[in-house]
Amino acid sequence: MTLGITEVKKGMVLKVEGDLYSVVKTEFVNPGKGSAFIRTKLKNLTRNSSIERTFKAAEKLESVELEKRNMTICYTEGDDIIFMDSNDFEQMPVSKEYVEDILPFLKEETPMEVTFYEGKPIGVIPPNFSILEVTYAEEGLKGDTSGTAQKRITVETGGEINVPIFVKQGDVIKIDLRDLTYVERVSK
């Protein structure tokens, strides 16, 4: 769908020079002299990088519609994660690169939203939190309570994270997947 610059809004997805970008920020400028333009901050959906771009009033932009599907992780295979569509149970490989940093904290059957463009997966939106059991934790040193004492633990999926020293093996913890930090202990 073709848009004029005044129709561009935050959250839209645009096709610019063959790449897909999500609009992060827009600023419409109408100077006293000369023609109007719009300054934008765009996030590349395939490369996960951001650019700032200015579009002149006469330019036409192409808006695209993305399909979002609720899917769950089945298993990993080579460089792919095999997802299953929650509606029709179709299995589809998706590149690990979309969730590479949080993969060690994801269990099988974790629900996620997978974004598609022209039938191909272009992004994965993971949940904000993961609840996992601690499988290995060293004992905290007695008296080591100055500041925010932390230790390294391993969770059931094999991921390692820093947690407060009171967390023990067998505890179930909540991890924030946006920044890979410990949130709290949860009851079993």
Curated annotation (Swiss-Prot):
GO terms for molecular function: translation elongation factor activity. It comes from the Bacteria. It is found in: Cytoplasm. Pfam families: EFP (PF01132), EFP_N (PF08207), Elong-fact-P_C (PF09285). SMART domains: EFP, Elong-fact-P_C. One of its GO terms (biological process) is peptide biosynthetic process. The keyword Repeat does not apply. The keyword Protein biosynthesis applies. InterPro entries: Elong-fact-P_C, NA-bd_OB-fold, Rib_uL2_dom2, Transl_elong_fac_P/YeiP, Transl_elong_KOW-like, Transl_elong_P/YeiP_cen, Transl_elongation_fac_P, Translation_prot_SH3-like_sf. Belongs to the elongation factor P family. NCBIfam families: efp, PRK00529.1. This is Elongation factor P. It comes from Leptospira interrogans serogroup Icterohaemorrhagiae serovar Lai (strain 56601). The lineage of its organism: Bacteria, Pseudomonadati, Spirochaetota, Spirochaetia, Leptospirales.
